[in-house]
């Protein structure tokens, strides 16, 4: 009989969640959620340790413990290639992309594309694509993997488990912004690594060491005769029950069905650039660093941590197949259905089955708590990032006059919509990719993200790339990828004991080769159209490319009337005159004279003085508010007129508490913004500075982590 959580395990789970909730409420109480950097970027105060841990946990959620271990059980070392590839791409993020994002003064990735190319077409395209990917590769997979853990530990129905997860996540979602997320991620990273290392050691000891794992894995085949007798099955054509001959190699032959090395290098790697260098959930955390040194340090730390999943997740998945060969390597769809409820295969239960069997009471509960809490942290981040992108980059373009409260309501309705679609998509995930969930994620992403990677790389490394080229190249790649994705869902892979009658261009062309074609076709079309159309303006490439990221800013650069985030000297002085609490001396010691010396380019945010008769307010562009002043990572910052402020003050204590708890209430902008913004700008101006000593240390770390990543590729591929 399979083990289930006992009273001690449940107590550990309850204590863990209480601790996480306390951290969330503490962060909600202490942090300022009403400003850009307060809620969205954690005040730009995070250190490299906290961000590095958060990057690791944001990526290695329960879906990785399910998916990586499951693919390890099904096909061996191959899936570890994604982890070592991520190790290298994280450094591309820290050394190339993040300095440009900081210099550009952007907060969302669609916003960067809009600033780099101008217009809104590409911004809306990327926002819509990001939302599709969040629903079909992140939310639905997270819900399924977390529910599978609950199903394995408590024996509950899969969909009951999904509903429970959503309810628990709703409790954590309101607790305090990016500060709370990063703090809880740090705790989860520590416990996750300790728990996973403990399970690895226990399972290794049981098997007899790493070399014994490799030997016994190649012999881990189910006892077909015993299974037919036990489950009363007919002796039909059995699925592939023996381990693959090349299971102990990572990068494999060009015709391999898992990881063909040309497809991985030329197609999968560019596709992964989207996730590690242009995905809102990942980039948002690194932008919270107090300076560029901490940002680079966080990617180094996360890179070193990415060495672990191969050993603490993939290898235990292989051990699970050794120990539970008759269940993990089910012999036909009927057998698989009886074992795990999926006709496509049972490799996804490899890790939870190992946890529930080998881990002692107490530690078992801690492992389950960490897995589910990490999942809910992922869901929280995805909900906030997705609602922010939809509200700022899509809805606000459609309805520019929308109030802050309207934006807030729309964001929450959109989150509910995403949850419904994600739950409806779970059955598709269960059956895709022969039950290997991680490969499902990669397949869907590889059909949609290579064009995005091509656009970001060209935008950063090629100044001549313009809006027309990027738009038509991106749309061509998207249409081709979407057609291939629709065909993949239309011509579903048959069950393993049935003949494959799909068209040759579906079954014989690996999705990584499709990704390769999409990436290079997009790049080629973008280059050709860009060369045939006018080049981008100097203002568009001044701070948004790799070659210009260290150039000085000129005074005329911010003279554009349509610049949405400018703050003029006149605004500063008049706001300080009209404020009751702001003196003529800035908190960092700068006087008005020194403020006059600031170049307009150095200031990203608008100070608005919404008072009658104030000439500054007459500037009045509805789009002049910064995105997160209007809607900060899913939380609205109310910036109404003084009349609305007075009305709010007269409301009951109950409603005041509700406003505070949900992050709806903020201080008057006219009373707080000058102090806050000048502090933020002083920090931003220093973020790109590095001392020579720190630069040397970081470069040594860069060399070390990249060398280790390349060594791992070579060691596991030869």
UniProtKB/Swiss-Prot annotation:
Keyword Ion transport: yes
Modified residues (Phosphoserine): 594, 632
Site description Implicated in sodium coupling, residues in chain: 24, 285
Keywords, ordered alphabetically: Cell membrane, Glycoprotein, Ion transport, Membrane, Phosphoprotein, Sodium, Sodium transport, Symport, Transmembrane, Transmembrane helix, Transport
Annotated GO MF terms: D-glucose:sodium symporter activity
Protein's organism: Mus musculus (Mouse)
Protein name: Sodium/myo-inositol cotransporter
InterPro entries, per database record: Na/Glc_symporter_sf, Na/solute_symporter, Na/solute_symporter_CS, SMIT
Swiss-Prot/TrEMBL GO biological process terms: inositol metabolic process; myo-inositol transport; peripheral nervous system development; positive regulation of protein localization to membrane; positive regulation of reactive oxygen species biosynthetic process; regulation of respiratory gaseous exchange
Reactions that this protein is recorded to catalyse: myo-inositol(out) + 2 Na(+)(out) = myo-inositol(in) + 2 Na(+)(in); scyllo-inositol(out) + 2 Na(+)(out) = scyllo-inositol(in) + 2 Na(+)(in)
Role of this protein: Electrogenic Na(+)-coupled sugar symporter that actively transports myo-inositol and its stereoisomer scyllo-inositol across the plasma membrane, with a Na(+) to sugar coupling ratio of 2:1. Maintains myo-inositol concentration gradient that defines cell volume and fluid balance during osmotic stress, in particular in the fetoplacental unit and central nervous system. Forms coregulatory complexes with voltage-gated K(+) ion channels, allosterically altering ion selectivity, voltage dependence and gating kinetics of the channel. (Microbial infection) Functions as a retroviral receptor for M813 murine leukemia virus (MuLV) entry.
Membrane topology: Multi-pass membrane protein
Gene name linked to the record: Slc5a3
